[in-house]
Amino acid sequence: MNDASSDPGIPGRPGDVVAAAAPREVGALVFRPLEIDTWQEHVIYMHPDCPVCRAEGFSAQARVRVQIGDRSLIATLTLLGAPLLNTGEASLSLSAARTLSARAGDVVHVTHAPALESVRALRAKIYGCHLDSVQLDGIIGDISAGRYADVHIAAFLTACADGRMSLRETVDLTRAMVRSGQRLNWDREVVADKHCVGGLPGNRTTPVVVAIAAAAGLLLPKTSSRAITSPAGTADTMEALTRVTLDSTELRRVVEQVGAALVWGGALSLSPADDVLIRVERALDIDSDAQLVASILSKKIAAGSTHVLIDVPVGPTAKIREDSDLARLDLAMTKVADAFGLKLRILRTDGSQPVGRGVGPALEALDVLAVLQCQPTAPADLRERSLLLAGELLEFCGAIPPGQGRLLAGSLLDSGAAWARFQAICEAQGGLRTPGQAVFRRDVVAARSGIVTSVDNRHVARTAKLAGAPRRQVAGLELHVRAGDEVVAGAPLCTLHAQASGELEYAFSYALAHDPFRIE
């Protein structure tokens, strides 16, 4: 038996020869690592003729309980024959193997998964019924415990989309998601937070706002998500600059040391059900109002925030397209916030076009550094949006009298105080690093001369994602024009950045076919 890895969290390497040793117990199998990546979905692989499959009557896609030692999880069964597996062997997806700390040769016990009572509530929701708090607690509890397959999660997300959740259900969903994880307490009257609902490429204001607010003396333990349907989330961008995977003890140390943090919320078990939902949402490319509200506010509540500023960009190609959509979102967020005693302020901002130049984690990180360092070439729109939001947050939290927030924010940025605080945050989290650069680049040029009348947010975001963002940290695109700019034929409109030539060409072809820039 050959185990190529000394790390118990990385179960062997492809091609390892694992002897088909006889299991030590009846009804058990021997673990053989195959390193199959299912993107965090727990899957077990068994031979269709293995004695356990026959004895238990397992078939493909069955939900089964998998145990190695004292650790267990629920997984989806996939049948896999020779030569990859023998009848006495089983394998696990990478995420399942890591969860169970599986090593080559371990004894694997596989039994039927217990029936899930919450599936009845899920079916009811699919048919349009309203769910009560007990039913939603059951669904979210099973999701956070890993008992739902991705198909069940996708069904739940779809059943809750397109206005199918009432305000009462949204409150109960948020409460269930808060209960699914730990809840932080900072023992302070004011714990500030800022969030953008997304849908606008670039717009990486959060790191700048956090640095300014922390320099003004506000406590800001900022937890952020990774991208759901966008080319980058705040956590993705910050990861290009520093370590963002901190546990709650490390987070508390950083906040006590420098007054703020910028970390990935998924490492803290704050509303862990939301992290599972986000993973499936990413594949579905959907983001419903109820789920959006519950996702945002459950994590703010769990993080111990008391005052939350929500940036809502509104524009024809943004996530929120009309003021009527904003009004509906405002009502839902206010209702949920009131139920938890959370102070909330929603700020409507211009969502007509991207903000900043970079779209993608590393490229957005460069914009953040340029603004914080007050570089002459820093994107003016990102600077102004950041100062607007920072000033609003300072006033909302009582750090400055009304009407003076923008002035104080500008002073803290121009004096270098915000940059110094940002450096301190990054150093406390593990050190500040320089964002990487992509191997391949290609310009998308203007086909004609004229005025850029609009920039399509969705096509810009899609192009950046096809180039590899956020999966490849350095991938994305760099914008060279904004609406209102005059261009000549052949002038670069944006530059694509990619780590693979195939992704570069794919993104380039999409940009040519869908042209994010309208020129008249």
Curated annotation (Swiss-Prot):
Keyword field: Glycosyltransferase, Transferase
UniProt keyword Membrane, yes or no: no
Disulfide pairings: none
This enzyme's EC code(s): 2.4.2.4
Entries under Pfam families matching the protein: Glycos_trans_3N (PF02885), Glycos_transf_3 (PF00591), PYNP_C (PF07831)
GO molecular function: 1,4-alpha-oligoglucan phosphorylase activity; thymidine phosphorylase activity
InterPro entries according to UniProt: Glycosyl_Trfase_fam3, Glycosyl_Trfase_fam3_N_dom, Glycosyl_Trfase_fam3_N_dom_sf, Nuc_phospho_transferase, PYNP-like_C_sf, PYNP_C, Pyrmidine_PPase_CS, Thym_Pase_Put
Recorded catalytic activity of this chain's protein: thymidine + phosphate = 2-deoxy-alpha-D-ribose 1-phosphate + thymine
EC supergroup of this enzyme: transferase
Gene Ontology cellular-component terms listed: cytosol
Gene Ontology BP annotations: pyrimidine nucleobase metabolic process; pyrimidine nucleoside metabolic process
Protein family per UniProt: Belongs to the thymidine/pyrimidine-nucleoside phosphorylase family. Type 2 subfamily.
Alphabetized HAMAP family for the sequence: Thymid_phosp_2
PANTHER family cross-referenced by the UniProt entry: THYMIDINE PHOSPHORYLASE
Name this polypeptide is given: Putative thymidine phosphorylase 1
Organismal lineage: Bacteria, Pseudomonadati, Pseudomonadota, Betaproteobacteria, Burkholderiales
